[in-house]
Regions:
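N-terminal core-binding DNA-recognition domain of tyrosine recombinases/integrases
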Residues: 1-4, 8-24, 35-124, 212, ...
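DNA breakage-rejoining catalytic core of tyrosine-based enzymes
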Residues: 119-135, 185-197, 211-217
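Basic, Lys/Arg- and aromatic-enriched nucleic-acid-binding interface segment
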Residues: 121-122, 130-159, 245
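Catalytic-site neighborhood detector that most strongly recognizes the C-terminal catalytic loop/helix
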Residues: 127, 266-298
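Conserved tyrosine-mediated DNA breakage-rejoining catalytic core shared by Y-recombinases
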Residues: 155, 164-204
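Short, polar N-cap/turn motifs at the start of nucleic acid-interacting alpha helices
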Residues: 170-173, 238, 257-277, 299
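Active-site/catalytic core of tyrosine-dependent DNA strand-transfer enzymes
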Residues: 195-238, 248
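Short basic/aromatic active-site micro-motif
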Residues: 221, 237-256, 264
Length: 299
C-alpha cells in the first residue's frame, strides 16, 4: 500500500512538471521562514556571517515582492528587477535564491533554467592611470580616507579583508606586512605588504585615534562608501576597492613580479604555499620581492 502511495505521488509530480509545471509554495509568515533560513545558512551551510546575512535579506526581499509565493514565475519576476544592475549584483541575488529555494526549501525545480550573468574578467575592466589615482587621492579630505585608499591600492586585498583586519594581530608594522585571516570555502587568506606612501598616512591615522578598538580602520559603512564616491568623481571613472585590487595585480605584473607571488599577495595561492611564507625566511623573501618591485601610487 505504501509503495503504491509513493508511486502515485511520484506520478502526480511528474504529471505536474510535464503539464502545468511544478506547484508553487506559499508562505504567510515571511519573517518566520526568513529566520529559519538564516539559521540554516549559518548552521547547515556554514556560511560566513556576512554571506548568511546577505542571503537572508535576499530571501526577505523576494518573499515580500512575491507576497510569499515561491514559483518559477515569481523568481523570474524578482530577478527581472536586477537586469539593469551589474552582473555581479544579479549573480549574488541568484546565488541567494538558489540557497533559499533549491537547498533550504528543497525545490530545485523552481530554479531550473535560470543562469548566471556573464561577469567580465579582470582584463575586461578599465584600469585607472596613475594620474587618475592621484586625482582620486587628492579629492579625499582627511587622513583616514587617504590611509584607506592607499592601503587598498598597495596591498591588493579584497574589500572585506581590509575592513576585518585587527591592528594588534594582523599587521607587522616593522615589516609593513599584512597577514589576512580571511579564509572561506571559496577565498583564501593572503600575505601582503603596504608601501612607504601608505605607511605615512596609516601611522598618522592610527596616531590620531583615541580609541583602542581592534579594527585597523574604524569606519561606518556610509562614510566608507563616500570615499569611493569622491574618488570616482575626481578620477572620472568608477574607483572601488575591487578596481584598486585589479590595478595592484596589473601594476605588479608590469613591474616584473611573477604571477605566483602576486597570487600570494592577493590570497589566490594554495594553503600549502602560503604556509611556507607566513614566517621567518619565507616572509622576508616575500618582502624583498614586494620592495624590489617599487610599487608607487602617487609618484
Amino acid at each position: 500500500r505504501n509503495k503504491r502511495f509513493e508511486y502515485d505521488m511520484v506520478a502526480r509530480e511528474r504529471f505536474e512538471l510535464s503539464s502545468a509545471g511544478p506547484e508553487p509554495a506559499t508562505f504567510k509568515d515571511i519573517e518566520s521562514v526568513v529566520s529559519r533560513f538564516w539559521e540554516y545558512c549559518r548552521v547547515d551551510e556554514r556560511l560566513e556571517p556576512r554571506v548568511a546575512k546577505d542571503y537572508k535579506n535576499i530571501a526577505r526581499r523576494f518573499l515580500r515582492l512575491s507576497n510569499g509565493v515561491v514559483s518559477h514565475e515569481s523568481v523570474r519576476a524578482y530577478l527581472k528587477t536586477y537586469l539593469d544592475k551589474a552582473p555581479k549584483t544579479y549573480n549574488n541575488q541568484l546565488c541567494g535564491l538558489r540557497a533559499f529555494i533549491s537547498r533550504f526549501l528543497s525545490r530545485p525545480e523552481l530554479m531550473e533554467g535560470l543562469k548566471k550573468a556573464h561577469e567580465p574578467k579582470e582584463y575586461d575592466h578599465e584600469i585607472p592611470t596613475k594620474d587618475q589615482l592621484r586625482r582620486a587621492f587628492n579629492a579625499l579630505t582627511d587622513v583616514r580616507e587617504k590611509a584607506i585608499f592607499l592601503f587598498y591600492a598597495t596591498t591588493g586585498l579584497r574589500c572585506s579583508e581590509v575592513l576585518r583586519l585587527n591592528r594588534y594581530e594582523d599587521i607587522d608594522f616593522k615589516l609593513r606586512a599584512v597577514k589576512s585571516k580571511h579564509d572561506t570555502r571559496t577565498k583564501k587568506a593572503g600575505i601582503t605588504f603596504y608601501n612607504e606612501e601608505c605607511e605615512e598616512y596609516l601611522l598618522k591615522y592610527l596616531n590620531s585615534r583615541e580609541d583602542q578598538k581592534e579594527r585597523l580602520f574604524s569606519i561606518g559603512w556610509r562614510p566608507f562608501l563616500r570615499i569611493w564616491d569622491k574618488a570616482s568623481e575626481a578620477a572620472g571613472m568608477r574607483i572601488t576597492p575591487q578596481v584598486l585590487r585589479i590595478w595592484f595585480s596589473t601594476e605588479m605584473g608590469e613591474l616584473g613580479v611573477p604571477d605566483r607571488y602576486v597570487d600570494i599577495f592577493q590570497g589566490r595561492a594554495p594553503k600549502t604555499v602560503l604556509a611556507k611564507h607566513y614566517t621567518g625566511k619565507g616572509l622576508e623573501r616575500l618582502k624583498r620581492i614586494y620592495d624590489k618591485a617599487g610599487l608607487r601610487v602617487l609618484n
